[in-house]
Swiss-Prot record:
Gene Ontology CC, one term: condensed chromosome, centromeric region
Cellular localisation: Nucleus; Chromosome, Centromere, Kinetochore
Lineage, opening ranks: Eukaryota, Fungi, Dikarya, Ascomycota, Taphrinomycotina
Major subcellular site: nucleus
Single annotated GO MF: kinetochore adaptor activity
Coiled coil location: 263-399, 484-560
GO BP annotations listed: attachment of mitotic spindle microtubules to kinetochore; attachment of spindle microtubules to kinetochore; cell division; chromosome segregation; meiotic centromere clustering; mitotic sister chromatid biorientation; spindle attachment to meiosis I kinetochore
Chain spans, region Disordered: 1-25, 46-73
Name this protein carries in UniProt: Kinetochore protein ndc80
């Protein structure tokens, strides 16, 4: 029992059957005791608390260490436990979502439990064995230590497994179906310990959560919800009225007026604080609404931003394609411009030559025959010129068609280059830092100014390297096939072992059936023998009655004979009972051994299944 003058008490966070909650606030550094949920006797009339929930009540009681347990004492070990666990709600079975079968999760839970036990001052030493699987006695000590952190007044009885079940019901442990009395007796079993470890981890988490909740400090205004201030005012009022009563003063109403004024002032302050809190609450609600609207607007803007980013990527890709096409068209236009300039220069030369010839012709004396000859030559030249013009138009058309074919070839080449780069990236030779690139740059790029229009020598450099990569990939594929075959053989071996274990399990079950039938036969035989003994005893009693009626002289002899027969019957019945108990013990021992063996087989099958699943996952990842 702690001293009542301590400044801060630890709340007992265990649930209580009482719904009464008392609250006190410290005033001027005075010591305060923690609240009690147990029924208490009031010394004076209780006033209603100013708690906003309207569920608290303040009771003037002597200073003492309260508890969350009811004020009842334990009368016997098995009758009742003096704590809050007298009434508990019904707990429906819930499937445990925690991965208790995972060894890593078990290690984490065990580490947290052991660390908390060391921090909380657990008296017994904790070794490596306690981290994973303590004994039954050690588990009982650990659970008592943890539960006393929640309810210091609870006392455990001789049979701790019943107390553990009752305490877990009181704590509303959601997975109570996994914690039975038979499991609590066999703590060291591998199939039992994960559920027990999960329960201990849950209790430790509950204790840590409640300790954090108790450690929270709530600041309260000095003149608002201060019960000690009210106590002081009431005490001053009682002292003044008592002195006035002793002095027989006529001013008996003056303390009442001051008391009323004090409470009115306190109520006014509380009203002002309430109004201020209401206005603050409304402002916060408005801020929350504006923040929610802002969040919705932000979400819309984020969606638009993501859409614009996607459009930007598409636009950049389109712009890059257009840029490459513009560059190719620009180069083609430059070539055509050069050709046009050459043709214009040739045309200028021809014009100059024509002018010179015309000048020569005009300065010459030409006869009619020569003129006719010149006219015919001119006509011939015109015809030749027209033929040359038609040929030039045909050549221009052919050049245009050739340009279209060249552009189509360039587009096809660009697509093939992109396809090559994507395939090279998939097989791991692009970029330079890829796995199979060997620090070589095999990324194709179109170079219109180069001799081969691309930046790499496909025949002498790229193709031999790709053939080498293909050979290496083929070798890796064959190696993976060999590994897959080995894994398949291992899986077949595991399946055969599982089949053998299943056959062995069926044999054990058949032997168990035969043992049970033999047990039933022994039970029937024992009952028949007992009936025979009972019939013989009845027969002897009837003979005794007949002997009593026939002869009074042989009474002593018959009495001695009856006593000897009764002693013999008791000995036979006792021997039969011992034989029956021995048979029951042997059958129970055989059943226990069979059950342990079956559980061991199940655990082995689960381990084999996990190994098989792990191998299968590794194989799948390797194939991917």
């Amino acid at each position: 029992m702690q001293d009542s003058s301590s400044y801060a008490r630890r709340y007992s966070q265990a649930p209580s059957s009482s719904n009464l909650r008392t609250t006190t606030f410290g005033f001027n550094g005075l010591g305060t005791s923690r609240t009690s949920l147990a029924p208490q006797r009031t010394l004076v009339n209780a006033r209603q608390s100013i708690d906003p929930d309207g569920l608290s009540s303040r009771v003037l009681t002597p200073t003492m260490r309260p508890s969350l347990a009811p004020n009842t004492r334990r009368s016997s070990v098995r009758v009742s436990n003096a704590s809050f666990i007298s009434q508990t709600p019904n707990i429906t079975s819930i499937k445990d979502p925690r991965p208790l079968s995972d060894r890593r999760y078990q290690q984490e839970c065990a580490t947290q439990v052991v660390n908390y036990l060391l921090e909380s001052g657990f008296s017994q030493p904790l070794g490596l064995n306690n981290r994973f699987m303590p004994s039954t006695r050690e588990f009982a000590a650990i659970f008592k230590h943890l539960y006393n952190k929640l309810d210091p007044n609870f006392r455990f009885g001789a049979r701790y497994e019943e107390d553990v079940t009752t305490c877990l019901k009181a704590l509303n442990y959601p997975f109570l179906d996994s914690i039975s009395r038979s499991r609590l007796v066999a703590i060291g079993s591998p199939h039992v310990w994960p559920a027990i470890l999960g329960m201990l981890h849950w209790v430790v988490s509950l204790i840590q959560c409640t300790e954090k909740a108790v450690a929270m400090v709530y600041t309260v205004e000095q003149n608002s919800l201060d019960d000690h201030l009210v106590d002081k005012v009431l005490f001053d009022y009682l002292v003044r009225t008592y002195h006035l009563y002793l002095d027989e003063s006529p001013e008996e109403s003056e303390p009442e007026k001051e008391l009323k004024a004090t409470f009115n002032q306190q109520n006014q302050d509380l009203y002002n604080q309430t109004e201020a809190l209401k206005s603050t609450n409304e402002e916060l609600i408005n801020q929350i609404k504006s923040a929610e609207e802002l969040d919705s607007a932000i979400q819309v803007l984020e969606e638009r931003y993501r859409t614009m980013q996607r459009d930007e990527v598409k636009f950049q890709s389109a712009m890059s394609g257009m840029k490459s096409k513009m560059e190719s068209r620009t180069n083609l236009m430059k070539q055509l411009q050069v050709n046009i300039e050459e043709k214009e220069s040739q045309l200028q030369l021809l014009k100059e030559k024509r002018d010179s010839l015309k000048y020569q012709v005009e300065n010459q004396d030409i006869s009619i025959s020569e003129f006719e000859k010149m006219v015919s030559e001119r006509e011939q030249l015109d015809r030749n010129l027209n033929m040359i013009g038609s040929k030039i138009s045909e050549l221009r058309k052919e050049v245009f068609d050739t340009d279209l074919l060249i552009q189509a070839s360039i587009d096809s080449l660009e697509k093939k280059v992109q396809k090559f780069n994507s395939l090279a990236y998939r097989i791991g030779i692009v970029p330079i830092a890829a796995i199979r690139s060997a620090n070589n740059d095999f990324e194709l790029e179109i170079n219109p100014e180069g001799p081969n229009y691309i930046n790499l020598d496909l025949k002498n450099k790229v193709r031999p390297f790709i053939n080498e990569v293909r050979r290496s990939i083929t070798l890796e594929f064959h190696e993976e096939q060999n590994k897959s075959l080995k894994l398949q053989e291992h899986v077949d071996t595991v399946n055969d072992l599982i089949a053998e274990l299943q056959d062995e399990l069926r044999g054990i079950e058949s032997r168990l059936t035969s043992v049970l039938s033999e047990c039933n036969m022994l039970r029937e035989t024992a009952s028949e023998e007992k009936n025979a003994f009972d019939a013989e005893s009845d027969k002897l009693e009837r003979e005794l009655q007949q002997l009593k009626l026939s002869s009074h002289n042989s009474m002593l002899q018959l009495d001695q004979r009856i006593q000897s027969i009764n002693i013999e019957a008791d000995q036979i019945a006792h021997a039969c009972m011992e034989y029956k108990n021995n048979i029951y013990k042997e059958v129970a021992f055989v059943l226990g051994e069979i059950i342990h063996f079956k559980l061991h087989v199940q655990d082995s099958l689960e381990d084999l299944k996990m190994d098989y699943q792990k191998e299968l996952d590794d194989l799948s990842r390797s194939e991917l």
